[in-house]
C-alpha cells in the first residue's frame, strides 16, 4: 500500500515544505500590515439646511446641493428658531459626499467598492413643554433621495439613484437643558447601503414631512442637527486584497488539478476524504476568483450579496471538511465498510447546512432587498433589530459551539491513537519508528487544523460584530487590522494547499521484505531498513478496501480488530 505523501515524504523534504508555507504565511501578514491601509474609512458630514423650493417637493428630478455652481443657501439656526412653525415642511437637509480636503475636491473611486450611511439625529423641544424625556421608539418618517454625478458632469447634473419614504425609530436621551429649549441626542440609525460605489460624487436630500391627519412627524419638537457618517472600504486595502486573491487563485487551481490527476492514476475509486479535499479546493477557488475587478468597469450592486454567498459556501465546505477530516481519523468504527456522507456524517453536516441556510435567508432578507432599495434595513424596526441581533448572537454562539465540538473530536482522535500506541513495543524497531513518525506528523497537522479553526471562528465572530457595530450603536472596541484579515485569508489558502499536497496519494512503493529476514538484521541496519520495509498486515480487513488512503488508519484499525 502506497499511502499518502504525508506518510512517505522524507523528513528533510517535509521540513522544506512546511518552512516554505510558513514563509508564505508571514508574507500574507506583512502584505496587510505594511502595504495596506486600514480596511475601512469614514467621513462625518454635518447636514446643510436649505429652504425647499415650493412646488418641487414631489419632483424626484430636483435636488438641492451645498457646493458648486447653483448651490442652495444654507439657513442659520436663528432663522429657523424665529419661525413660528420652525419652518416645518420647508427644510431640506443636504449631504454632499465626499467632503473636500484642504480646498481640494475629492471623489470616490471604484476601488472603494461600497458605501454605508448611518445617521445621527439631534432633536429639540421647547423648555416650556412638559416633555422631559421623549418616548422610546419614536417613529420618524423620512423622504430620502439619493443622487449621483461623475467627474465630467456639470455641477447641476445630478441624477436620481434611489428614492424612498422610510420609517426609522429613535431612542433619545437629554443632552442639554437650556432656558429656551432642551436638546436630545438619539442613537444612530442605519440609513442606506450601496453594494457598488460606481460614481464619483453622491448627494443625499432628506425631508421630514409633517402631516396632522396622518400624525406624521408630530411626536417631537423639531430637528436640531443631522450628522451623516459615510463608511467606505479603503481603495488601497482593496488593491492589496485583490493582488492577494489574484496570486493565490492559479496556485490553488493548479494544485487541485495535480491532486485529482494523482487520485485517478490509482486503480480505485476516490475515498471520501479525497472527495472532500477536492470540493474544499473548489470552494476556495470560487472565493479566490477576483470578481471584484469587474466592478472597476461595470456597476454591480449585487457584489456585496455575491461576496457573502461565496464566503458562505466556503465556510460551509470548510466546516464540513473539518468534521469529516476528524471523523475519518476516529479509527474505531462500527463498520469497516466504506465511509459515506449519508452513513456517517449526515447528523453533523445537517447542522452546518441548516446554520448556513439560515444565515443565507437572513442575508437575502436585507441585502437582496437593498439591490432595489438601498434605504431598506432590517434594523429599522425594534422587532427587526431584535431579530437581526438574535441572528448575529446565535451565529456567534453556534460558531463557538462548533469549535468546542471539533476540539472534542480531535481529542477523541488523539485518545484513540494514544490507546493504539500500546501495540508499538511489540513491533520491530523499524516499523515502530515509522509509525511513531506518522503519529507525530498527524498530531502536528491536527493541531494546525485547530489553530486554523480557532482563527476562522474568531474572524467570523469579529466580522459579525463589526458589521453590526454601526447598527446597534454599542461602544465595542474592535481593531480589525489589515494584517489580521490578509493573514487569515492567506492562512486558509496555505492550510488547504498543504492538505491537498500532504493527503495526495503517494506513488512511492515499499519493496517487499520477508519477516524472517527482519530477525537476522543487525542492530545497525534496523533503523536504515525503515525506509525500505513493507508495511504489511495480512489479516487486516481494511486491506481489501480499495478506498483506504492512510497506512496510519490501517494500523489503528488493525489493532482495534485484533
UniProtKB/Swiss-Prot annotation:
Residues 1-15, 261-275, 333-344, 412-441, 504-562 are cytoplasmic. Pfam families: WLS-like_TM, WLS_GOLD. GO terms for cellular component: cell projection; early endosome; endoplasmic reticulum membrane; endosome membrane; extracellular exosome; Golgi membrane; multivesicular body; neuromuscular junction. Keywords: Cell membrane, Cell projection, Developmental protein, Endoplasmic reticulum, Endosome, Glycoprotein, Golgi apparatus, Membrane, Postsynaptic cell membrane, Segmentation polarity protein, Synapse, Transmembrane, Transmembrane helix, Wnt signaling pathway. One of its GO terms (molecular function) is Wnt-protein binding. InterPro entries: WLS-like_TM, WLS_GOLD, Wntless. A segment polarity gene required for wingless (wg)-dependent patterning processes, acting in both wg-sending cells and wg-target cells. In non-neuronal cells wls directs wg secretion. The wls traffic loop encompasses the Golgi, the cell surface, an endocytic compartment and a retrograde route leading back to the Golgi, and involves clathrin-mediated endocytosis and the retromer complex (a conserved protein complex consisting of Vps35 and Vps26). In neuronal cells (the larval motorneuron NMJ), the wg signal moves across the synapse via the release of wls-containing exosome-like vesicles. Interacts with wg; in the Golgi. Interacts with Vps35, a component of the retromer complex; wls stability is regulated by Vps35. This is Protein wntless. It comes from Drosophila grimshawi (Hawaiian fruit fly).
